[in-house]
Structures are given as C-alpha cells and as structure tokens.
Swiss-Prot record:
PANTHER family for the chain: TRNA (GUANINE-N(1)-)-METHYLTRANSFERASE
Name assigned to this protein: tRNA (guanine-N(1)-)-methyltransferase
Listed EC numbers: 2.1.1.228
Species of provenance: Nitratiruptor sp. (strain SB155-2)
Subunit structure: Homodimer.
Localization, UniProt: Cytoplasm
Highest taxon, organism lineage: Bacteria
Length: 226
C-alpha cells in the first residue's frame, strides 16, 4: 500500500513515522508514504494557496486550483481519495479494515476554514471526520486514520491476534463553502452566494446545513422547522 498526503505541512507529518510500529512497517516495506505540498502547485508568485469566501463568512478557504493540480498529478486508476473535514461521516474501525485493502490512499488535508465544496464533489471517493471537534488542520485526522488503517495490514503488528481482540457548535454541520473562480471544472457557485444579499445567503446556508447534516450525520437529531 502507498499513502500520499496532500498538505501545507509535510515536515509536521513526517515525524509521526520516525518511531514505533509504523517506522518498522515502513522499513519492512509493508507500506510506503509520500508527502505533497500544496504550495508546489500554487500559481501565485508568493505561493499563497488561500482565498476569501464567496458570500462572506469568517476565515479563508484553500484555493481549489493547486489542490486539483496536485491530485491530477499524483492520481492513478487505483487511487482512493479521502478528504478530511469535520462535516463528514465518522471514521470507524470498520472503515480502517476496509481501507487496508486499498493499493493507494490519498489524504487531502484541510487548513484554514476548509475546502471549496467543489473539490469534494469532483475528487472525493470518501469524506471522513474523526469526531465532533475542530482541529487547526486535517493532518492529525489523516494520521489518526492512517494509523488505524496500517495496523490492519498483514505483518504490521507482531501479534496478529491483537487485531481480533480489539474491540460543535450547535446541532447542524456547517453549510458548503465556495471561493474563486465562480465556475470550476464545469461546476458553478450557487447563484445566491454571488448576489451579496446576506439575509438570503444566511437562510440558504441554514437549509444547506440541514440537508448536509441529515445526509452525513443521520444520528444527529434535527428538530422539524415550525
């Protein structure tokens, strides 16, 4: 298995594999790792990869073009692309066991306020959260999932029997976000976001948040609108 990490902080992630079980598994070539810096694909002379949100809202979003270019560069037929975000289904041990059979997993790690939603729509094979809490970036989440996945690769654990014995804010998830360009890979930003009517944008975001929560987190109870 090969695991590729798309990130703004490759050096931050490398150190996790310098010790313990994962280091030994790498040395035995039971899996391999690769780190890709978004900035290497930036079209900005200052290597910036963040943009303001369309329609307003706090914080910046990762610009879609560098991430798309990075994915186009490294993706192969057998690649399985996973986006890390708190607004997704919960990663479980069942997922870890299933993904341990993949030949190539690509973790796309968020920063700032996350991704332009169109990236997920175009490229994601799966979208995972590791819990109802917010981190400063997706790197820790992808490392958590990687650890859980790699442990299920035959030969990684000294005792295979170990595997057999192992056992937000508010009620809604965040609505989709978008940044420039207005049209990306044939997908346009929702028109209401471009009109600047913040009351309508707020109402639309609320409805989108309800739909997203029902879709990704059916375990969350959502009260019916009155």
């Amino acid at each position: 298995m090969k695991i590729t990490y798309l990130t703004l902080f490759p050096n931050l992630m490398r150190c996790y594999f310098e010790d313990s079980i994962l280091k030994r598994a790498l040395e035995k070539k039971l899996f391999e790792i690769e780190f890709i810096d978004y900035r290497a694909f930036s079209h900005n002379k200052h290597k910036k990869v963040d943009r303001y949100k369309i329609g307003g809202g706090a914080g910046m979003l990762l610009e879609p073009r560098p991430i798309a270019d990075a994915l186009e560069f490294i993706k192969k037929k057998e690649s399985w692309v996973v986006f890390t975000t708190p607004v997704a289904k919960r990663f479980t041990q069942k997922d870890a066991k299933r993904l341990a059979h993949k030949k190539h997993i690509v973790f796309v790690n968020g920063r700032y306020e996350g991704f332009d939603e169109r990236l997920i729509e175009i490229y994601a094979d799966e979208v995972f959260s590791i819990g109802d809490f917010i981190l400063t970036g997706g790197e820790l989440a992808s490392l958590v999932m990687s650890d859980a996945i790699v442990r299920n690769i035959p030969g990684v654990l000294g005792n295979s029997a170990s595997l057999e014995e192992e056992s937000f804010e508010g009620d809604l998830l965040e609505a989709p976000s978008f940044t420039k360009p207005d049209v990306f890979k044939g997908k346009a930003v929702i028109k209401e976001f471009l009109k600047g009517n913040h009351s309508k944008i707020s109402a639309l975001k609320y409805q989108l948040a309800r739909l997203r929560t029902k879709y990704y987190r059916p375990d969350k109870r959502i009260e019916d609108e009155k």
